[in-house]
């Protein structure tokens, strides 16, 4: 491929999605090395360039066709979409799929001494946030007027510093809120990481590569969510044992050498196999039960 036909993927330079994004791409067979001093990393085995940028720059880069793909939190994507709708600015992208990492929620929080009944308790108060558009949409839907305080970071310290009465910020565990004397009152948006693609014209070779990558992403995530189960089972309780396997698709049943009363079962389960289920399998005569992770899946 020529330089202009190399696929450009934007990922977060640092932060909560950076490591998981890199690991996902490596699991898809894309070989690259990150130099912390450089914003671009070239794949060794595919015509792909990784652009390491601020997370809030990624949606715009994709929507404007500067890059072809982006891995981004849905919260940042939604914030940019609302901004562009407000400015009547085009947002040319498609969400290819949600990913299995980056879970968080955008929530309202207030100081521990604040008496909160519902969102109307914030009427007329000042709220600090890095997501003014998502906050405004929520408050407008509730019919609540407020004053905003736009901060790019350290939002949780705003009430203690006297900058705001409450905050609207990302929450994962709530530990940061607690450490700053705040408590969560209302979830206004739930988010996961996702893959987005620019809808500006792609060359056939680029689109083919995008399709390959998406197929691999799907396979990696399916593998993470699945387990490979092997066990020996008595033929007389075979149907009961198969019925117990969670989410199994048409397990493979094989005869055992020199044992006509037992068979081997191989199955891929898309649900967790809990200890209780394994004990039930054992009670039905199953033995040699193995539950193993799957690295890759396709088809």
UniProtKB/Swiss-Prot annotation:
**Transferase listed as a keyword:** yes
PROSITE patterns named in the record: ATP_P_PHORIBOSYLTR
- Cited Pfam families: HisG, HisG_C
Keywords attached to this Swiss-Prot or TrEMBL record, sorted alphabetically, are: Amino-acid biosynthesis, ATP-binding, Cytoplasm, Glycosyltransferase, Histidine biosynthesis, Magnesium, Metal-binding, Nucleotide-binding, Transferase
Provide the protein name. Answer: ATP phosphoribosyltransferase
GO MF term set: ATP binding; ATP phosphoribosyltransferase activity; magnesium ion binding
Q: Which reaction does it catalyse?
A: 1-(5-phospho-beta-D-ribosyl)-ATP + diphosphate = 5-phospho-alpha-D-ribose 1-diphosphate + ATP
Taxonomic lineage per UniProt?
Bacteria, Pseudomonadati, Pseudomonadota, Gammaproteobacteria, Alteromonadales
Q: Which GO terms describe its biological process?
A: L-histidine biosynthetic process
Which pathway does the UniProt entry assign to this protein? Amino-acid biosynthesis; L-histidine biosynthesis; L-histidine from 5-phospho-alpha-D-ribose 1-diphosphate: step 1/9
Q: What class of enzyme is it?
A: transferase
Q: Which gene encodes it?
A: hisG
Cofactor needs: Mg(2+)
């Amino acid at each position: 491929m020529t330089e202009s036909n190399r696929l450009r993927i934007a990922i977060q330079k640092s932060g909560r999605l950076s490591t998981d994004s890199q690991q996902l791409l490596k699991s898809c067979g894309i070989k690259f090395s990150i130099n912390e001093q450089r914003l671009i990393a070239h794949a060794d085995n595919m015509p792909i360039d990784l652009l390491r940028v601020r997370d809030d720059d990624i949606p715009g880069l994709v929507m404007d066709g500067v890059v072809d793909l982006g891995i981004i939190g849905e919260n940042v994507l939604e914030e940019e979409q609302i901004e562009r709708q407000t400015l009547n600015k085009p947002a040319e992208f498609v969400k290819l799929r949600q990913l299995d990492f980056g879970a968080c929620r955008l929530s309202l929080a207030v100081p521990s001494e604040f008496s909160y009944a519902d969102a109307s308790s914030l009427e007329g108060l000042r709220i600090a946030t890095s997501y003014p558009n998502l906050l405004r949409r929520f408050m407008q839907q509730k019919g609540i007027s407020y004053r905003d305080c736009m901060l790019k970071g350290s939002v949780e310290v705003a009430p203690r510093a006297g900058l705001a009465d409450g905050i609207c910020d990302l929450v994962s565990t709530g530990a940061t809120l607690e450490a700053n004397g705040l408590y969560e009152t209302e979830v206004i948006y739930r988010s996961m990481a996702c893959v987005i693609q620019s809808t500006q014209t792609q060359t056939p070779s680029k689109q083919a590569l995008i399709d390959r990558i998406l197929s691999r992403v799907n396979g990696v995530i399916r593998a993470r969510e699945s387990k490979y189960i092997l066990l020996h089972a008595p033929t007389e309780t075979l149907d009961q044992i198969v019925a117990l396997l969670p989410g199994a698709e048409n397990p493979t049943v094989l005869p055992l050498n020199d044992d006509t009363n037992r068979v081997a079962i191989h199955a891929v389960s898309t649900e967790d196999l809990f200890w209780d289920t394994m004990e039930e399998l054992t009670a039905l005569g199953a033995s040699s039960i193995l539950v193993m992770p799957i690295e890759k899946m396709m088809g």
